[in-house]
Amino acid sequence: MASRFPKFSQGLSQDPTTRRIWFGIATAHDFESHDGITEEKLYQKIFASHFGQLAVIFLWTSGNLFHVAWQGNFEAWSQDPLHVRPIAHAIWDPHFGQPAVEAFTRGGASGPVNISYSGVYQWWYTQGIRTNLELYQGALFLLGLAAVSLAAGWLHLQPKWQPKISWFKNAESRLNHHLSGLFGVSSLAWSGHLVHVAIPESRGQHVGWDNLLTTLPHPAGLAPFFSGQWSVYSQNPDSASHLFSTSQGSGTAILTFLGGFHPQTQSLWLTDIAHHHLAIAVLFIIAGHQYRTNFGIGHSIREILESHVPPGGGLGQGHKGLYDTLNNSLHFQLGLALASLGVITSLVAQHMYSLPSYAFIAQDFTTQAALYTHHQYIAGFIMSGAFAHGAIFFIRDYNPEQNKGNVLARMLEHKEAIISHLSWASLFLGFHTLGLYVHNDVVQAFGNPEKQILIEPVFAQWIQSSHGKTLYGFDVFLSSTASPAFYAGQSLWLPGWLDSINSNTNSLFLTIGPGDFLVHHAIALGLHTTTLILVKGALDARGSKLMPDKKEFGYSFPCDGPGRGGTCDISAWDAFYLAIFWMLNTIGWVTFYWHWKHLALWQGNAAQFNESSTYLMGWLRDYLWLNSSQLINGYNPFGMNSLSVWAWMFLFGHLIWATGFMFLISWRGYWQELIETLAWAHERTPLANLVRWKDKPVALSIVQARLVGLAHFSVGYIFTYAAFLIASTSGKFG
């Protein structure tokens, strides 16, 4: 008999119902649960799959380069980045009538095209690409890397080339290689690329493979480097009148500390960026030589952790036992990696708009909005995943004997205090913030706006002032002309910083008031509630007062039947599931805030945000309703326009989102009865009953239906907001 899906589980493949298919898909990546798995095989499978992941990434980026080179207008755009709209790719759609063809033919194209809102044009332009040929070469190179990655993945699945488990558990070697090789050398390479290729290109001098080795990036060559006169490299920077990509107003410096933005491109100085990456490279290359490997010198991570015991004895065993716990648990490692990556992704969102590093991207408002929103949503999912794997660690990998009295054990011992404090913080934030908003709504509705409770964010304003923002009149640190730091800053470090922080043409340290104070606390409510659910899910994953043996039930279970009342909805998976709704809710508030504040600033109408954001009806009416008007006016006498596709996506996103509730607010019995009725009718319908199926159709399990509901909710939520964001921004600014 032919083997049936899933091959990795003999038991599941013999299941006579459709459960076989869904459970097979659900556990396909849970390698730990597969038949015949050993620890070594587990590590080897994951290792090989990383090469597949790299191949997908290289193929995807290659496709971006290829389609822009083939169907885009990169060369025309780079002649006039502020007025030509960048084209992502052509649209081939046989259903397009003449009005649609006209509506979507833009950016100087001869037929319908999509406009690029990803920022890749600005990114490629900044790093020195100027021609379609260079884009094609990049696409080909990345295609080659994808092929190499696939070959490496296949190779590392062959018995002869599979690394041993001791290699995977060699923490010091891995850390050294990642610090020095991954971060250090790649930062050095990027700094080198900026100095040798991007900076000359920004000054109108093309550097290609033909003249790379003969063109000096700095007139003094390497002499100042070897003689220790490194400051020579920072002398004669580009002037404030420099025109990007030309020699007009350009200097010769390659490593600077100017601060602020290039006046024309409104992006960070390339010479500052090169300096930053060189410094990072030096630090990380040194850091990658800290840990003890073959030569018997350097730190042992085990020794560091074992000796981290707090003095006095009042805080337990500190980090004792953590080395083996961490080094033997992939879920622990993944949890830490996801937590770090999630924070970094959110920081990317915050820094891409406040300190834009790509030329002219700050003036492409739709791209700025899209990139901020994209990175914040990604960060939300990644951070939630960190807690999910933290919970799985506690269920599958945590050994109480190994961790007696250390920080992990102590976290579990006083989890009630942690959870109740988080709960208190969430309740406090929720009631007070909502109370203020609702009060303001009521007095607005009764025609007494002067009775609103408006609180100035004085502490945040003070922090902004200490960084040099003079608007609030605090006269402290960098905003005080009497401060030594202020004087040093004029010439010694970051002379351009104070000009930038006090300029109204960028998003650096935006002016804040009562509306910001309120929405800040609304976001804090969302963050604390999401964290509460995730932390409780992880800390209660092994057991709780209600269900002390929860660990035996695994990560996801619906209930333990009627004999133990109240054991439904308390698995670690349920906490994760609930937290995702709160996470989406929170990121929604974050992106609403960012977008509305920037729309007001970009339109030169900051008062709109300041006056309407202090009460809920202001958000609903002046942000959501006002900006979705172009998407919900349906058919009009003017016919098709370039926002029509977003209007359709806005509608379709709502549909997907609403479909989620069908799975979330109906129970299994309903579906089972419906399925049986449909199957009964099918078997008795002529012609239809010629089609048979082997598996008995059964309803999704409770956990599966929740997952399907959550997936529709999330996808619909994001699609709807993406369409709203791009249409409302591009409709105003192009």
From Swiss-Prot:
Location(s) in or outside the cell: Plastid, Chloroplast thylakoid membrane
Reactions it catalyzes: reduced [plastocyanin] + hnu + oxidized [2Fe-2S]-[ferredoxin] = oxidized [plastocyanin] + reduced [2Fe-2S]-[ferredoxin]
Keyword terms: 4Fe-4S, Chlorophyll, Chloroplast, Chromophore, Electron transport, Iron, Iron-sulfur, Magnesium, Membrane, Metal-binding, Oxidoreductase, Photosynthesis, Photosystem I, Plastid, Thylakoid, Transmembrane, Transmembrane helix, Transport
Amino-acid positions noted as binding [4Fe-4S] cluster in the UniProt annotation, renumbered to this chain: 559, 568
Any one Gene Ontology BP term: photosynthesis
Subunit-level organization: The PsaA/B heterodimer binds the P700 chlorophyll special pair and subsequent electron acceptors. PSI consists of a core antenna complex that captures photons, and an electron transfer chain that converts photonic excitation into a charge separation. The eukaryotic PSI reaction center is composed of at least 11 subunits.
Family statement drawn from the similarity comment of this UniProt entry: Belongs to the PsaA/PsaB family.
PANTHER family associated with the record: OUTER MEMBRANE PROTEIN, OMPA-RELATED, PHOTOSYSTEM I P700 CHLOROPHYLL A APOPROTEIN A1-RELATED
Chain's role: PsaA and PsaB bind P700, the primary electron donor of photosystem I (PSI), as well as the electron acceptors A0, A1 and FX. PSI is a plastocyanin-ferredoxin oxidoreductase, converting photonic excitation into a charge separation, which transfers an electron from the donor P700 chlorophyll pair to the spectroscopically characterized acceptors A0, A1, FX, FA and FB in turn. Oxidized P700 is reduced on the lumenal side of the thylakoid membrane by plastocyanin.
Name this polypeptide is given: Photosystem I P700 chlorophyll a apoprotein A2
Origin species: Chaetosphaeridium globosum (Charophycean green alga)
Gene from which the chain derives: psaB
